[in-house]
């Protein structure tokens, strides 16, 4: 067998004008070769066809450019038949194998084409030498070897039995009807990778093969032979030379690796090679609008494309669903509040009435009468016709379907109705009053009248029953309004709630700690608030219980102390032991109103009562002088200023006692002592106290206290000792904040009375009780002898029988400055502040006795330091 070698190297071409010239030249030479082959037989025709392909390749090689594109040169039918005839001479296993490869749409290597044609030429030469077959026999053999391709079944029409075809990346899957060996042969190809980009070479282009091959080994594939994508690679640079080394000619040769070093298709030169993106497919090009079918597969039918699109949509939908599920699962895991955990009470701003409320909020019977449709009225006919016209405009297609029944409607509406006599009477309100319905066909009543009468009777009964039920619900609500909670009633008084509209469900949602016009609390918030409210209520109740217990205990103690006061008074209050008990009791309980006047007289002047009889001016005598004289105007205005300054602008002022107070002050002004600091406060509080029955008692006790407890010696000691930097008061008020107050102009006896002006009457009397008792004298050991004191003045009496106790006054001032120094700057400023200010401040929830007792305890604590 003579071998043929191709002298020229193939070069890539561009498919522009060169492609059209190359195709035209190839077709012309192919036709000449086909005609010649028909005359000379299968062998000669094959060679002529081969020459035609070679000539076409040379023509394309002459117009080659730097870009490589895929080129398929069409061949004539006679050319294909000549090649088929040459292939039909193959016998034995080669014949069956070649027929199987050609008859099935499966890819084949270029080396397989070469091996097949070499075998066919070698068998043809042996047949020519032995006589061979005639062309007709060859054609018959070809017809038997290559059957007419039949359209595969629906399962085999798709190239793979699995869903690999429907993936996004095109793959070279085997045909469903192909065998396993064909599948291996189809994938047993050589790929060229690395830095050079490879493209698919056209089957009509010749290869530059080694010198061991002859020209007869170059085969042009027929229309049933295919070239696997990626089996051949051509570089973009036109100057590059390629060397193809066929390692093995049989069908079972192994695939060539895709590395640059081991590739059988190597670049000898041509450094300027085209680069491709990593991951890009270099096997073949196809349209995005069609399926990823290789050139070796047939075009898909519409049903196949539909199945492909459906499968791709399902895959994309499943992928999207999985992504969304994953996203929402991640989001749900981060949410603090799930939808299931949303409390229904949070949706509060939607006005919804319960059935018990909405039952009597419906329209009354008069409104229902207006809404009833009268069929015989022409106005109702126009309304119905207008509704039908509007419906025709909105739903033209739907109304066309029912157009047969619509023309009959105006006739029924315009047809005069015979109304029975009983329907023109009063409407029926009870089911028992409904008359017997006439039987259609027997009575002289049409079907329309029968239905209309029945509907009207039932409607009137239903409306009446609804009205009665609404009236009953309304009466029930009105009767239950008096049992509603107080907070709801308060909102009704403010015009923010209607008691009739308050249902049981609303009462369940409303909480007592929030107004009804505000949004209700959530379940969690309501439970938390109820827990806190119950806790505070428990604390308040415990405190109230303790307060009541202490009040009860204090009342019992006061009662016992009052009995002790009476017992001490009977036993002798001027005894030393009695005075000790009296001092102890006075810090716990004030003297009772019944015993105060007698105790004051006994403690301050003993049972002899020498001071009242000798050193005090008589009340009746001064009053008679006042009646006989014209009281000076300037003195009267001075008294009014004193009352306004010390009494009127202070707490507890009452205008009822103004005349008595003015009289006492006038009497004091015309006395030998004259008006003194504190007279107005003493007279005013004694007048408001029940301990003194007459003005004479008040006059004597007030003057007695002024002469004994607040005498001149006590005043001088108070003014000098209270501002002494080494005194007890200075040590108690050692804070730098009191430095500005420790002056003689601020801390003195006159400013001390500013404190007494701000004290309530009950506490004032208790303070006076303590001051009087702390200034007591043990007259049992020092009994007063009237004969010895007959010629003695008041100063002698004070030095011998009066106790000077300025410490009780200084301790009171220190206690007020330490514990109640708020609302005023100093004792001098205390005179000019609001008249409602008092010491101590009282609250409505706290008992006055408890506050007064607390004040006395603090004062006693400071007095112990003196």
UniProtKB/Swiss-Prot annotation:
Pfam families: SBE2_C, SBE2_M, SBE2_N. GO terms for biological process: fungal-type cell wall organization; protein transport. Residues 24-49, 72-94, 119-199, 249-282, 390-424 are annotated as: Disordered. GO terms for cellular component: Golgi apparatus. Keywords: Cell wall biogenesis/degradation, Golgi apparatus, Protein transport, Transport. Residues 79-94, 252-263 have a biased composition (Low complexity). Its main location: Golgi. Residues 153-180, 189-199, 273-282, 397-408 have a biased composition (Polar residues). Signal peptide: none annotated. InterPro entries: Sbe2/Sbe22_C, SBE2/SBE22_M, SBE2/SBE22_N. It is found in: Golgi apparatus. Belongs to the SBE2 family. With SBE22, is involved in cell wall integrity and polarity processes like bud growth. This is Protein SBE2. It comes from Candida glabrata (strain ATCC 2001 / BCRC 20586 / JCM 3761 / NBRC 0622 / NRRL Y-65 / CBS 138) (Yeast). The gene is SBE2.
């Amino acid at each position: 067998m003579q071998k043929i070698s191709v002298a020229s190297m193939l070069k890539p071409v561009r498919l522009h004008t060169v492609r059209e010239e190359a195709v035209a030249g190839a077709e012309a030479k192919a036709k000449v070769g086909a005609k010649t082959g028909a005359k000379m037989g299968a062998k000669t025709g094959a060679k002529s066809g081969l020459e035609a392909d070679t000539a076409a390749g040379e023509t394309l090689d002459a117009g080659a450019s730097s870009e490589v594109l895929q080129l398929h040169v069409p061949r004539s039918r006679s050319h294909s038949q000549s090649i088929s005839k040459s292939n039909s001479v193959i016998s034995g296993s080669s014949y069956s194998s070649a027929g199987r490869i050609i008859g099935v749409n499966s890819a084949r290597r270029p080396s397989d084409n070469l091996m097949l044609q070499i075998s066919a030429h070698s068998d043809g030469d042996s047949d020519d030498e032995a006589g061979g077959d005639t062309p007709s026999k060859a054609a018959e053999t070809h017809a038997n070897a290559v059957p007419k391709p039949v359209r595969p079944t629906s399962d085999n029409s798709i190239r793979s039995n699995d869903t690999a075809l429907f993936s996004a990346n095109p793959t070279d899957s085997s045909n469903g009807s192909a065998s396993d060996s064909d599948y291996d042969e189809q994938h047993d190809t050589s790929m060229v990778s690395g830095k050079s980009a490879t493209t698919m070479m056209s089957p009509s282009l010749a290869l530059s093969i080694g010198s061991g091959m002859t020209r007869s080994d170059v085969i042009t594939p027929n229309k049933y032979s295919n070239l696997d994508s990626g089996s051949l690679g051509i570089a973009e640079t036109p100057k590059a030379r390629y060397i193809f080394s066929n390692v093995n000619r049989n069908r079972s040769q192994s695939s060539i690796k895709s590395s640059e070093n081991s590739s059988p298709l190597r670049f000898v030169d041509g450094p300027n090679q085209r680069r491709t993106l990593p991951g890009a497919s270099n096997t073949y090009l196809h349209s995005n609008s069609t399926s990823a079918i290789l050139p070796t597969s047939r075009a898909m039918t519409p049903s196949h494309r539909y199945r492909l699109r459906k499968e791709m949509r399902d895959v994309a939908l499943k992928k999207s669903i999985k992504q969304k599920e994953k996203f929402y699962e991640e989001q749900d895991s981060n949410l603090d509040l799930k939808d299931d955990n949303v409390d229904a009470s949070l949706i509060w701003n939607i006005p919804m009435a319960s059935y018990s409320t909405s039952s009597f909020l419906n329209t009354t019977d008069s409104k229902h009468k207006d809404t009833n449709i009268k069929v015989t009225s022409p106005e109702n006919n126009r309304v119905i016709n207008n509704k039908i016209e509007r419906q025709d405009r909105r739903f033209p297609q739907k109304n066309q379907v029912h157009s047969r029944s619509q023309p009959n409607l105006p006739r029924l509406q315009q047809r005069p109705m015979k109304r029975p006599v009983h329907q023109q009477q009063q409407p029926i309100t009870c089911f028992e009053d409904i008359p017997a319905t006439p039987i259609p066909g027997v009575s002289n009543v049409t079907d329309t009248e029968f239905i209309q009468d029945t509907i009207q009777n039932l409607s009137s009964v239903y409306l009446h029953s609804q009205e009665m039920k609404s009236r009953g619900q309304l009466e029930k609500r009105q009767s239950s309004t008096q049992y509603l909670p107080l907070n709801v009633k308060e909102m009704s008084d403010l015009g923010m709630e209607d008691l009739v509209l308050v249902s049981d469900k609303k009462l369940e949602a409303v909480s007592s700690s929030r107004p009804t016009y505000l949004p209700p609390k959530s379940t969690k918030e309501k439970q938390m608030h109820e827990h806190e409210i119950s806790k505070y209520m428990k604390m308040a109740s415990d405190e109230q219980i303790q307060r009541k217990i202490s009040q009860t205990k204090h009342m019992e103690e006061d009662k016992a102390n009052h009995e002790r006061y009476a017992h001490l008074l009977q036993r002798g209050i001027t005894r030393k032991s009695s005075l000790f008990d009296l001092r102890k009791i006075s810090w716990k309980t004030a003297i009772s109103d019944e015993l105060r006047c007698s105790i004051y007289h006994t403690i301050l002047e003993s049972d002899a009562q020498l001071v009242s009889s000798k050193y005090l001016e008589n009340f009746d005598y001064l009053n008679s002088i006042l009646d006989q004289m014209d009281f000076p105007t300037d003195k009267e205005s001075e008294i009014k200023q004193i009352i306004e300054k010390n009494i009127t602008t202070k707490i507890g002022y009452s205008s009822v006692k103004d005349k008595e107070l003015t009289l006492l002050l006038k009497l004091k002004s015309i006395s030998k002592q004259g008006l003194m600091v504190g007279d107005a406060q003493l007279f005013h509080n004694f007048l408001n106290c029940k301990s003194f029955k007459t003005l004479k008692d008040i006059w004597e006790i007030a003057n007695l206290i002024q002469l004994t407890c607040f005498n001149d010696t006590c005043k001088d000691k108070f003014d000098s000792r209270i501002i002494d930097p080494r005194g007890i008061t200075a040590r108690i008020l050692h804070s730098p904040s009191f430095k500005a107050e420790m002056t003689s102009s601020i801390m003195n006896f006159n400013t001390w009375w500013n404190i007494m002006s701000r004290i309530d009457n009950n506490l004032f009397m208790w303070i006076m009780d303590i001051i009087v008792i702390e200034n007591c004298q043990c007259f049992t050991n020092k009994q007063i002898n009237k004969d010895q004191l007959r010629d003695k003045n008041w100063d002698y009496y004070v030095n011998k029988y009066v106790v000077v106790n300025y410490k009780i006054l200084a301790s009171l001032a220190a206690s007020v400055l330490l514990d109640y120094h708020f609302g005023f700057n100093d004792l001098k400023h205390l005179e000019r502040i609001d008249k409602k200010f008092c010491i101590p401040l009282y609250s409505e929830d706290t008992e006055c006795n408890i506050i007064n007792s607390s004040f006395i305890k603090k004062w006693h604590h400071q007095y112990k330091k003196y």
